[in-house]
Amino acid sequence: MDYQQLANQIKQWAIELGFEKVGICDVDLSEHEPALQAWLDAGYHGEMDWMARHGMMRARPAELLPGTLRVISARINYLPPQAQFASNLSDPNQAYISRYALGRDYHKLVRNQLKKLGEKIEQEVGKLGYRPFVDSAPILERPLAQKAGLGWTGKHSLILDKENGSWFFLGELLVDIPLPVDEPSENQCGKCTACITSCPTNAIVAEGVVDARRCVSYLTIEYSGVIPLEFRRAMGNRIYGCDDCQLVCPWNRFAPLTQQSDFHRRQSLNNADLVVLFEWDEATFLKNMEGSAIRRIGHQQWRRNLIIAMGNAPYSPRIIDTLQRHLGQSELLDEHIHWALEEQTQKTATPRQHARLIRIIEKGLPRDA
């Protein structure tokens, strides 16, 4: 069999299935094992125990599917039209949701596309051992993507491509056929440190190393406990994930919009008013978030994140009333509500003093000099 011709055909099939780019690499990730172990030993994975539980299996694809010879790494863009980054982040009364989560959950969509790709290959070669992976499986997808030529690992630890930035999902198809491999990508970050200096919680502790325990994405999505005080103000209005390190990256000026309508903003998130989203009861949350990656954090965590955002919002009697009405429903939520109410109350002093000063000036001075 002409494996080079097959590799070319696989890449064409992938494009037809909706992927933007596909690359092929071998399964040797041994050079990444020391860094992975050091990251785990430092506790940077936080409470994501499954990462430590799988250990070095993440760097050994052949242990996930015995007989694996190659990894087909695929990329699909998710940047939605009218992303409204600046207008959303600059309005503290509106919730900011990481742009990857505005539409449908990508896991099923990308996995299904990879499965179809595997089926096409099997039809061509006969019996084929293959298995698709998307994000949640214990596999080092970013080193694989770099090795397959899809981009390099940026200082924020995400994969970057000079023509497409970083607004894309990755998926892998493990196969047991000896396809020719692609050239790995070379790092193009240079001396730029925009992502490191712009992280609101200083979570990027070294080039390419993120302490998840400090990362807003981890805190709002993976962590279900009490948010440490030191991070609450820095979270701002970010209630699900954070895009700051991508927003400041110069390479993302070239990022194209997604061709997948499933990744467009869902209608239920058109009104991102903090109070409106917080007032959703659990049934409404589950209904509005059906098919969304957001759904898996659950209603309580959704509200916890919104409480912090309301604490960070400008002084608002509406917010104070909303928070007070929901006291006593949960110890976890109460912990954050008390903090948010204190934050809101502190904000009333300065505006009131300012208003008093203005009244005195208006009444006491013959003119506004």
Swiss-Prot record:
Pathway the protein acts in = tRNA modification; tRNA-queuosine biosynthesis
The entry's family comment says: Belongs to the QueG family.
Q: Where is the active site?
A: 135 (proton donor)
InterPro entries according to UniProt: 4Fe4S_Fe-S-bd (IPR017896), 4Fe4S_Fe_S_CS (IPR017900), QueG (IPR004453), QueG_DUF1730 (IPR013542)
Q: What is the lineage of its organism?
A: Bacteria, Pseudomonadati, Pseudomonadota, Gammaproteobacteria, Vibrionales
Cofactor: binding details: Binds 2 [4Fe-4S] clusters per monomer.
Q: How does it assemble?
A: Monomer.
CC cofactor: cob(II)alamin; [4Fe-4S] cluster
Q: Where does [4Fe-4S] cluster 1 bind?
A: 189, 192, 195, 249
The reaction(s) annotated as catalysed by this protein in its Swiss-Prot or TrEMBL entry are: epoxyqueuosine(34) in tRNA + AH2 = queuosine(34) in tRNA + A + H2O
Q: Which Gene Ontology cellular component terms are annotated?
A: cytoplasm
Do the record's keywords include Secreted?
no
Keyword Repressor attached: no
Protein name as annotated: Epoxyqueuosine reductase
Location in the cell reads: Cytoplasm
Native organism is: Vibrio cholerae serotype O1 (strain ATCC 39315 / El Tor Inaba N16961)
The residues the record assigns to binding [4Fe-4S] cluster 2 are 199, 215, 242, 245
Where does the 4Fe-4S ferredoxin-type domain start and stop, copy by copy? 177-209
Please describe what this protein does: Catalyzes the conversion of epoxyqueuosine (oQ) to queuosine (Q), which is a hypermodified base found in the wobble positions of tRNA(Asp), tRNA(Asn), tRNA(His) and tRNA(Tyr).
Give the enzyme's EC designation. Answer: 1.17.99.6
What are this entry's molecular-function GO terms?
Answer: 4 iron, 4 sulfur cluster binding; epoxyqueuosine reductase activity; metal ion binding
Q: Kindly state which keywords UniProt assigns to this record, in alphabetical order.
A: 4Fe-4S, Cytoplasm, Iron, Iron-sulfur, Metal-binding, Oxidoreductase, Queuosine biosynthesis, tRNA processing
GO BP annotations of the record are: queuosine biosynthetic process; tRNA modification
